[in-house]
């Protein structure tokens, strides 16, 4: 905090992002969004029993908690390493000709840019845009660059790079599998075309996967923001659409199919409306609307943190529509009861 404040930045550990309400919404969106991620939910099909599923969920929560609690520490260390590289001691700035190799490597990618504004041959780093000479430092490079900045051994750098690549590929593969199976098996075969052949179902799965890859490629060319912000946005969309339906499907026997569908469409629709109003339709900056509204006009909430409010809309609409439509069939209500009370369990018995 002392080093950050010396350079004119806000204190790191006590800095509140816009407001306490916004921070609460951000945290809640990440929490419930995690529970609604499709590639996480699908992992429960890999265990044989309910007991193993619960154990798997418990261990998943442990590792997710470790990830969430250590991420701010990694960010703090990365920021401190960069500041100590540029300003090793108070008032002594790094000479441009003596900048380390990692500096030059990332300059070649265009993700790190310096500009000697005062012509003194040194790099000044400060919160003042007019005097700051580190004009661009892409936040997406910090995880990969941090071991090199800290001068760790090459094998550590390779391990971090391999871990990042493996995480990206495994997540992408899990999401593609979830998307393709949901559309081909659950939607087409389970709802609209129950007599569809296996070959047609496989072709539908391939088409859905190709469409998902095309959509991901488009978002790669027009990213909504830096990586962490984009991930938070994805968690918010999962929170506003999947999580409420998942919870009501487990704990409510009165929510109807029409209510669940209406709730999901309303939740994700409201969230996308708020996100696109800030970032442009399909994240194209020129395709904006309601420009007269101030940024974060809904109680100072950022678009990446809006997922929890979309979830509230989802719950409300689903419950309302369920009251206006016929009750679910008995077999569905029995299925919900069976989910909560697994096979082999029974009601509590009072022993004398």
Where are these regions (language model features)?
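Membrane-embedded helix-loop-helix hairpins and adjacent transmembrane boundary segments
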Residues: 1-352
């Amino acid at each position: 905090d002392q080093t950050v404040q010396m350079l004119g930045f806000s204190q790191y550990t006590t800095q509140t992002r816009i407001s306490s309400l916004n921070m609460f919404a951000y945290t809640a969106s990440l929490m419930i969004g995690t529970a609604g991620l499709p590639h996480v939910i699908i992992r429960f099909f890999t265990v044989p029993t309910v007991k193993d599923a619960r154990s798997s969920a418990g261990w998943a929560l442990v590792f997710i908690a470790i990830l969430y609690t250590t991420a701010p520490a990694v960010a703090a260390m990365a920021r401190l390493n960069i500041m100590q590289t540029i300003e090793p001691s108070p008032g002594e700035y790094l000479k441009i000709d003596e900048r380390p190799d990692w500096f030059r490597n990332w300059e070649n990618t265009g993700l790190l840019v310096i500009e000697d504004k005062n012509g003194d041959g040194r790099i000044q780093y400060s919160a003042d845009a007019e005097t700051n000479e580190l004009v661009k430092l892409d936040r997406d490079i910090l995880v990969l660059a941090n071991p090199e900045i800290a001068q760790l051994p090459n094998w550590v750098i390779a391990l971090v790079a391999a871990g990042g690549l493996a995480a990206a590929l495994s997540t992408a593969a899990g999401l593609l599998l979830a998307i393709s199976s949901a559309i081909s098996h659950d939607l087409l075969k389970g709802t609209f075309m129950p007599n569809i052949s296996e070959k047609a179902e496989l072709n539908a799965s391939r088409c859905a996967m190709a469409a998902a890859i095309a959509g991901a490629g488009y978002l790669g060319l027009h990213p909504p923001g830096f990586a962490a912000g984009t991930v938070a946005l994805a968690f918010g969309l999962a929170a506003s659409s999947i999580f409420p339906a998942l919870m009501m499907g487990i704990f409510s026997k009165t929510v109807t199919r029409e209510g669940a569908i209406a709730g999901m469409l309303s939740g994700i629709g409201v969230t996308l409306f708020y996100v696109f109003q800030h970032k442009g339709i399909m994240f194209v900056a020129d395709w904006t609307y309601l420009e007269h509204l101030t940024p974060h006009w809904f109680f100072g909430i950022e678009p990446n943190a809006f997922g929890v409010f979309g979830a509230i809309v989802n719950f409300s609409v689903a419950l309302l529509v369920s009251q206006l439509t016929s009750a679910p069939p008995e077999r569905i209500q029995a299925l919900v009861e069976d989910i909560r009370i697994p096979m082999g369990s029974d009601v509590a018995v009072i022993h004398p």
